Amino acid sequence: MPPKKDPKGGKAPPSKKKEGSGGGKAKKKKWSKGKVRDKLNNMVLFDQATYDKLYKEVITYKLITPSVVSERLKVRASLAKAGLKELQAKGLVKCVVHHHGQVVYTRATKEADVIVE
């Protein structure tokens, strides 16, 4: 038997999709260019000028961490840690927090820790 035809005749007009509806090919998102950081060229050993700066300037900072010293004196973090241990041994800085990941020092005050109540 042949297929039945619409009594009205002709084909139904194809339904148009609304714009912005899901599906279809959307414009592909491009990868953003990552931020490029300059290579740090930090010193591995103290020279005399930097060593003097460690003793004069670093002990005046309120917050002293290896990362702060490394950034300001342009030395490696391991060298900054060693310098801060030396300053602590001489009593020029005082350890506030000793965490396994970060050590925080502050300048040593003249008065021995006097707690005012």
From Swiss-Prot:
Molecular functions per Gene Ontology: structural constituent of ribosome
Domain of life: Eukaryota
Pfam families documented for this protein: Ribosomal_S25
Regions that span the bilayer: none
Keyword vocabulary terms for this entry: Ribonucleoprotein, Ribosomal protein
Biased composition (Basic residues): 25-34
A GO-annotated cellular component: cytosolic small ribosomal subunit
Entries under InterPro entries matching the protein: Ribosomal_eS25
Stretches for region Disordered: 1-34
Family note: Belongs to the eukaryotic ribosomal protein eS25 family.
The protein, known as: Small ribosomal subunit protein eS25
Organism: Caenorhabditis elegans
